[in-house]
Amino acid sequence: MNCGPGSNDKKKFVKKNLKIVRRKIGKNTKDIFLLHQVHSNKFIFLEKNKKIPKKSPIVDAIITNQEKLPIAVLTADCVPILLCDNKLKFIAAIHSGWKSAYKGIISKVIKFMVKKGCNKNNIIAAIGPCISQKNYEV
C-alpha cells in the first residue's frame, strides 16, 4: 500500500491509500504531515504556532514541537526512527536509508533538537523494522 506523495505511483491511488490509512487511525485526510523523501540528510522543523506547509517538503526527517500534529515517514527497506523528548514536547520522525545514515541524518536531527533545548539524555528513540544486510546488497 503506497502512501508516498513523492512516489512514481499514480497520485489518485496514493490519495486513496492515504484516505484508508487516515480513516483507520481516526484522522482527517489532511491531518498527517508527510514528506517527499529522497534519501538525504535534510530535515524540516515545524515550530509551535508557525504555519504548516501545504506541500510535502523534499526532506527525510521532520522535527516538531507542535501539539496534536501527526507526523510520519514512509519506509520499505529503510529504517524508520522516531525520537521524543517528553519534557520539552519535541518529536521527530526520520527516514534513514543507508544514504541518509551515511550522510549523518540521525545525528543531525538529534543535534538540532539539543540546539533547541532538548537534553540528549531525555530523548527516547524507537527504531522500526527494516531490511537486513543478509537480504539486501548495497
List PLM regions with ranges.
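Active-site microenvironment for binding and transforming phosphate-containing groups
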Residues: M1-V138
